[in-house]
Structures are given as C-alpha cells and as structure tokens.
Amino acid sequence: PTEVSCDYVFVCHMRRYKNVVNQPVKKIITSNLREAKEYDHMLNFASYSCQEPAIMENSGLMCLHFLMHMGIAKVSIAGLDGYDITNRGNYVNSGLEYDFTAEQLQERNELIAKEISALQEKMEIDFLTDSIYKR
C-alpha cells in the first residue's frame, strides 16, 4: 500500500512488480522476473522458493528464507495472516486476488503453516497482526 513507508519491497511476481515499478522504493526481486528492468537487487528464485509446488512462489515465505539466509535471527511481520477459504478479501488490493478454490486455499494454509513452523526452529518470527500461522 502507498500509505505505508518502507525501505525495500520484496517482489517475486510480475503482476506485483508492475504495481511497484514506479514507486520511489528500493526493489528486491527474484530471477524469475525476466522482464523486470528497474530493481536494486535480484535474488536467485530457486535459492529461496519453497519445495512444495502449491506455495513455491509465496513471497512472504521467500522473503523469510532470504532473511534467514542473511543471518537475521528475529523478524517482525504484518499481513501474513492466512488465506480466508471463502476467497474474499485476502489482499489489501483486490487487484492482487487469485482465483483459488476453498480446498486449494486450505492446502496453502496448511503448507504455509508447516513451512513457517520449520522456519521458527531457526529464527524468531513475531506476528504483528493476527495470523492463523502464529503458534
């Protein structure tokens, strides 16, 4: 959102990149964004993506993997609240919504929870907003 000030934006989807390309913020992108021209840092997609195909491109998880790789011991995160299986209002910007079935959303929630649990064994994750992934 434009009303939130930040130093960097982490992007691994071209659709989201197009929303931030002209914003005055530093961009960290992943190597799968072959058409991207305006960025500050590019990371190897395969190095930080999840093994599970259903959540392979989850930007929140990719960012957490990157931060862990950088040696960050504690992360505070907002907005990683989990998918609403009714598939309504999962994103602040409705233009970023995906068309998933309730079963797909439930599977994603379970896989993300498992991945976050594994990450929490290596780093402290503090959820600033309500999240189904908070343990």
Task: Please provide the spans of the model-predicted regions.
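Metal-ion/cofactor- or nucleotide/acyl-coenzyme-handling active-site neighborhoods
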Residues: 1-135
